[in-house]
């Protein structure tokens, strides 16, 4: 059934997005998207250079799991278009749509560096998954956009590699190979959620 495939695909994309915030090497890829201190349509195009490389292994599994490649492609286009619309401060709350969809309000929360907004609202098209998994947070207080400690640069090279540089530095300073692996695959902490290295 196509609608079941779309629903499962949406939760699958949500899980990948969550991993992009909870696994440090994936956060090193994704954090450039969150480094903007503004929230507007242009932020949706501020994508990681290595994002496609990190997504390929994850999303290649979908056809193996039985997802129709055509539906995956169409869902990818819809998701991209919805993602552009979601990066705005122009659109306020959308009434009953807020209960089901990942609206601009919900996505503003996701881009917030306010403590109560960190690691919230990973949803792709639907916000119901975040409500089910306990990662939902409504927009209540004004959102402070950007990283915990912002990058203070517009240099795209620095923005792209800042997470990698900080992670590699921590790995170099680790006491063992096992500790290095924990740094690479472990969660980012407050320090590594920043743009300083």
Segments predicted by a language model, with ranges:
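Single conserved hydrophobic/aromatic residue that forms the stacking wall/gate
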Residues: 1-12
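Transmembrane alpha-helical core residues of multi-pass small-molecule transporters
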Residues: 9, 33, 78-82
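Juxtamembrane helix-loop transition segments at the membrane interface in multi-pass membrane proteins
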Residues: 16-33, 98
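Juxtamembrane helix-capping/reentrant segments at transmembrane boundaries
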Residues: 31-47
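Cytosolic/stromal cytosol-facing helical appendages immediately following the last transmembrane segment
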Residues: 38-42, 85-197
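Core segments of transmembrane alpha-helices
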Residues: 48-61, 123
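Alpha-helical transmembrane segments of multipass membrane proteins
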Residues: 56-64, 80-84, 128
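Transmembrane helix interruption/hinge and helix-loop junction motifs
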Residues: 64-74
């Amino acid at each position: 059934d196509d609608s079941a495939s779309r629903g499962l695909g949406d939760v699958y994309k949500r899980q990948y997005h969550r991993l992009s915030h909870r696994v440090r090497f994936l956060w090193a890829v994704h954090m450039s998207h969150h480094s903007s201190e503004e929230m507007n349509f242009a932020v949706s195009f501020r994508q990681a250079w290595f994002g496609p490389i990190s997504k390929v292994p994850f999303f290649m599994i979908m056809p193996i799991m039985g997802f129709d490649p055509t539906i995956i492609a169409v869902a990818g286009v819809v998701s991209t278009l919805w993602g552009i619309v979601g990066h705005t401060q122009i659109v306020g709350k959308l009434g009953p749509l807020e209960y089901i969809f990942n609206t601009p309000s919900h996505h503003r929360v996701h881009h917030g560096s306010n403590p109560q907004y960190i690691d919230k609202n990973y949803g792709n098209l639907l916000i119901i998954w975040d409500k089910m998994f306990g990662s939902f947070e409504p927009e209540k207080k004004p959102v402070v956009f950007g990283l915990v400690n912002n990058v203070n640069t517009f240099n795209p090279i620095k923005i792209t590699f800042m997470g990698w540089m900080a992670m590699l530095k921590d790995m170099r300073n680790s006491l063992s190979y096992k500790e290095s692996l924990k740094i690479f695959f472990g969660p980012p902490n407050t320090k590594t959620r920043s743009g300083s290295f």
